[in-house]
Amino acid sequence: MNGAIITDNERINIEPKDVMVKGSNKKQGVNAQTSTQRRPEHQGMAKVIINPGTPDFNRFLTARNGAVIRGFDDVSIAISSLFKTVDAVKHPDLVQAIQDWFNELHEENNKMKENLVAYIKSIEFDKNDSFMSSTQFVPFSFEPVQLNFNNHNTMRFYKYIFEMNQLMNTMYEYNSLGLLAVSDYPVMSHNIIKSINLYVENVKKTLNVSRRKDGPYSPAEFITKVMQYKSVQAYIAAEMSGKRR
């Protein structure tokens, strides 16, 4: 598929406003919601509602009794704890070193999204064709998934998930209409889900989330290592290169 991937701007017009970020509108101590998704620890956090658009993405998000969502939560907590622990006033260079690494992760995801958008734009069909103009695609309807966050880096990751879900939906529709090569949709669906899993794996391993003992996550070891090596990348190269992809 030439490494490319997804979009018809009329069908998928992704703008920042498309990310349905909602802040809590209830007063402190007032239980204004009875939803089981609303837990006390979500107070003071933003949330985004993702409506899975394809069976593949729905299976991914709901697999293993919610293990994927729990992994997202682990990453969100670790990122939030990390940036709350590091004093940006006393250690601006350390904060920047950590952010530089996150920027690299986000850039990798952005490249995949851009390739997908370019691929979708390249898909052409005759809008004057009477058969094509008579066809309609009936979208799937799955239970929505709520993701909670309170850090810029987690927001960027969840925005990527939100947008890739939309792009996969467009790919599925085009595939249903017979507009894609036979292997394009399954290959790209696999690659998108893999990219999301890879981000989670990289963050959990590098921030030592996967190796934490029972109890709340502490970023102390990671911070010590970054201060020692002066960058996250140098720390990974020196001590973790054999443990990663």
Regions found by a protein language model. Give the residues of each.
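Polar/charged low-complexity regulatory segments
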Residues: 1-160, 166, 173, 190-245
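Conserved hydrophobic residue
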Residues: 179-180
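Short hydrophobic alpha-helical segments that form membrane-spanning helices or hydrophobic packing faces
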Residues: 184-189
